[in-house]
């Protein structure tokens, strides 16, 4: 099993009071694991309730229960525990 860690980054608000731009970083022994951790960090930085619902559901990267998600981007590179990924998205309530 891979070891994983996540870090949430930034807290910029967009022009609409109901939207936020978020980013998160994750590291894991695999790219898929690091992407998962990065998206978890985005959700945790946005809304712990949405994160909990996401964890109980299909756990699809780019989705957030209770939010419309757009501008999703994930970039990965070698680093950290094997792979390091950053996820970026705009989430609107």
Predicted feature descriptions by range:
Residues 2-10:
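Bacterial N-terminal signal peptides
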Residues 3, 20, 42, 69-74:
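Extended aliphatic helical segments
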Residues 68-93:
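C-terminal edge-of-domain segments
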Residues 21-61:
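Short, well-ordered alpha-helical segments
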Residues 63-67:
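Acidic-leaning, charged glycine-interspersed low-complexity segments
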Residues 17-22, 77:
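C-terminal alpha-helical interaction appendages
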Residues 10-17:
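Sec/Tat signal peptide C-region and signal peptidase I cleavage site
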């Amino acid at each position: 099993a891979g070891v994983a860690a996540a870090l949430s980054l930034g807290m910029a608000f967009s022009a609409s009071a109901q939207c936020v731009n978020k980013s998160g970083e994750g590291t894991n022994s695999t790219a898929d694991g690091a992407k998962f951790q990065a998206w978890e960090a985005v959700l945790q930085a946005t809304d712990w309730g949405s994160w909990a619902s996401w964890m109980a559901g299909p756990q699809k990267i780019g989705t957030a229960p209770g939010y419309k998600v757009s501008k999703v981007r994930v970039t990965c590179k070698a680093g950290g525990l094997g792979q390091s990924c950053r996820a970026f998205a705009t989430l609107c309530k």
